Regions:
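Positively charged n-region of N-terminal signal peptides that target proteins for export
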Residues: 1-4
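Bacterial N-terminal signal peptides
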Residues: 6-15
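Sec/Tat signal peptide C-region and signal peptidase I cleavage site
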Residues: 16-20
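Catalytic-domain carbohydrate-binding cleft regions of carbohydrate-active enzymes
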Residues: 21-420, 425, 437-439
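Solvent-exposed beta-hairpin/edge-strand motifs
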Residues: 432-444
Length: 444
C-alpha cells in the first residue's frame, strides 16, 4: 500500500526539479540606475544662456522620454531651476508636475541650489535646504530626502550632520573619482556604498554614483559585465549608477534609456532598477539593521582643482560672507522689532535676499571657476542682497531705537550687537560737532 505513495512523491520531486530548471535564475546582484542631466547654472556660460537654452532642453527632452518609455525615471536637482521652468515655460512645467505626482520625475537634492558645501556657512547650507524643501512642498506637495551633488569640489565633515538634522537620509556624488591621490591603497573613495558619520556622530548613507555621463547603446543591461563587476565592489552586491549627461543639462540618450528598459525585462544575473536618487537609501532603512555597511568618519576632500577653488574670485567669497553675516543680523533685528510690536516682520524681503545670493553659492560660481561674464550677474545679485539686508537692518534697528529712552546729556548713541553673546570690542561712531572737540567722554 505504500508503493503508490512513494512513486507519487517521486513524480512530484521530478516535476519540481524540472520546474526549477526552467525558471529564471535568482538575481542576487542589483543595479540602481539613476538618470540625471547635471546642469551647471553658470560655468563656461552665464545664467541667461542657462535659462534660454539648457533649462529648456532639460525640460523638453525629458518630457519626451517620460512619455515614450514607461519605466524611465528622471532625477533633477536645484529649486531655482524649477522656478525658472515655472516662470519661462509654464505649459511644460505643468506637464512636469504631473510626472512628479506619478513618481516618474523625481525631485532630488533637497536644496534651492546644488551649492558648494565648503565655503558657505552652516546657516547658509541649512537655509539652502529649507528654501528648497519649502519650494518643493508648495509646488509639488512633496519633499526630497537626499543630498544630490554629482559635481562638487569636496565635501566637509559637517555635511552628514547638516543633512541628518534636516531630516535627510543619504548623499551621492561621483566627483571623488577626480582625485589624484587615493584615500588608501588604490581607492579614491572610502567605499562605494556605506555610512558616512558626521562630526556629531550623525550618520547618513553614502553612495558613489560613477560617471554621470555614462551611455549605453540599446543593450540588455541585465547582462552587462561592467555593471556586474561594480556590484562586487560592495558587501551589498549592489551598484548605484548614474547615467545621462552633464554640465549643459539635457537628458540621457535614447540608447541609454532603452538599455535600462531592456535590462528591467532581461534574464541576466543583474536586477536592473530604474531608480530615484534616494531609492537605495530608503531600501536600506533603518541603517542600524545593516551591520555589513562600512562606516567612514571624516571629510571627503578633492586634491585637484578643488584646492584652487577656495582662493579664486576672492570678491565672490567676500560678498558671500558679508551677505551671510548681514542677513543673520538683519533677521535678528527684524524679529526684535516685530516682537516689540514696533514693525512688521519683513519675511518676504528677507527670503528674497537669501534666495538671490544662495543661488550663487553654486559649485562653479562661488568657487570662482566660471567665465568673467558670469560674475557680472553674480556680483550684481550679491550687491542687491547686501542692499536689501542693509535696508531691513537699518529699518529694524531704527524702529527699536525710536522706542528707547535716549534722554541723556550729550549725543545718544545706540549700539546693536547682532551676536548671541556679549562682546567687548572697539566701535567707531561719527558725530556732528561745530568744531573738533578737545575730548570726548563716553558713558554707558
Amino acid at each position: 500500500m505504500k508503493l503508490p505513495v512513494i512513486l507519487l512523491a517521486s513524480e512530484l520531486l521530478c516535476s519540481g526539479s524540472m520546474h526549477a530548471q526552467s525558471a529564471k535564475p535568482e538575481k542576487k546582484a542589483k543595479a540602481y540606475m539613476v538618470a540625471d542631466a547635471h546642469l551647471d547654472t553658470q560655468w563656461n556660460w552665464d545664467v541667461q544662456t542657462t535659462i534660454k537654452e539648457y533649462v529648456w532642453n532639460t525640460l523638453s527632452r525629458n518630457l519626451f522620454l517620460l512619455k515614450k518609455y514607461p519605466d524611465y525615471i528622471f532625477n533633477f536637482e536645484g529649486g531655482v531651476k524649477y522656478a525658472w521652468m515655472k516662470e519661462y515655460f509654464p505649459s511644460e512645467y505643468e506637464q512636469l508636475k504631473a510626472f512628479v505626482r506619478s513618481g516618474r520625475w523625481h525631485i532630488s537634492g533637497s536644496s534651492w541650489e546644488a551649492s558648494d558645501v565648503l565655503v558657505p556657512s552652516v546657516e547658509s547650507s541649512i537655509r539652502n535646504i529649507l528654501l528648497g524643501q519649502e519650494y518643493y512642498r508648495k509646488e509639488f506637495g512633496t519633499e526630497s530626502t537626499d543630498i544630490f551633488l554629482p559635481d562638487c569640489f569636496g565635501f566637509g565633515w559637517t555635511l552628514p550632520t547638516i543633512a541628518k538634522h534636516c531630516g535627510l537620509i543619504g548623499f551621492s556624488s561621483q566627483k571623488l573619482d577626480w582625485r589624484n591621490h587615493p584615500f588608501y591603497g588604490e581607492s579614491k573613495h572610502p567605499f562605494m556604498l556605506g555610512l558616512w558619520k558626521g562630526i556629531d556622530g550623525s550618520s547618513i548613507m553614502l553612495a558613489h554614483g560613477y560617471d554621470y555621463g555614462k551611455r549605453w547603446n540599446n543593450i540588455d543591461l541585465s547582462e552587462d559585465k561592467e555593471l556586474l563587476g561594480l556590484t562586487k565592489r560592495t558587501p551589498l552586491n549592489t551598484v548605484y549608477r548614474y547615467y545621462g549627461t552633464g554640465d549643459t543639462g539635457g537628458s540621457p540618450s535614447i540608447g541609454s534609456v532603452s538599455s535600462v528598459e531592456k535590462g528591467i525585462k532581461g534574464n541576466g544575473p543583474l536586477e536592473i532598477i530604474s531608480a530615484t536618487s534616494d531609492q537605495l537609501f530608503k531600501d536600506y532603512l533603518p541603517y542600524e539593521k545593516h551591520s555589513e555597511l562600512p562606516v567612514f568618519n571624516g571629510e571627503l576632500l578633492m586634491d585637484v582643482h578643488g584646492t584652487g577653488c577656495y582662493t579664486s574670485q576672492a570678491a565672490m567669497k567676500l560678498y558671500n560672507r558679508q551677505n551671510e553675516l548681514l542677513g543673520d543680523a538683519a533677521e535678528r533685528a527684524a524679529v526684535a522689532a516685530d516682537w516689540l510690536g514696533i514693525a512688521g516682520y519683513p519675511g518676504e524681503s528677507l527670503t528674497e535676499a537669501w534666495k538671490r545670493f544662495i543661488f550663487h553659492q553654486f559649485h562653479d560660481d562661488l568657487t570662482g571657476t566660471s567665465i568673467p561674464r558670469a560674475y557680472e550677474f553674480s556680483w550684481n545679485d550679491e550687491l542687491l542682497s547686501l542692499k536689501q539686508f542693509s535696508g531691513v537692518l537699518t529699518a529694524s534697528v531704527g524702529a527699536v531705537s525710536e522706542k528707547m529712552d535716549t534722554r541723556v546729556k550729550g549725543i545718544p548713541v545706540v549700539f546693536y550687537n547682532a551676536l548671541g553673546f556679549p562682546v567687548t570690542d572697539v566701535a567707531e561712531v561719527a558725530i556732528e560737532a561745530p568744531k573738533f572737540p578737545k575730548g570726548v567722554s563716553v558713558y554707558n
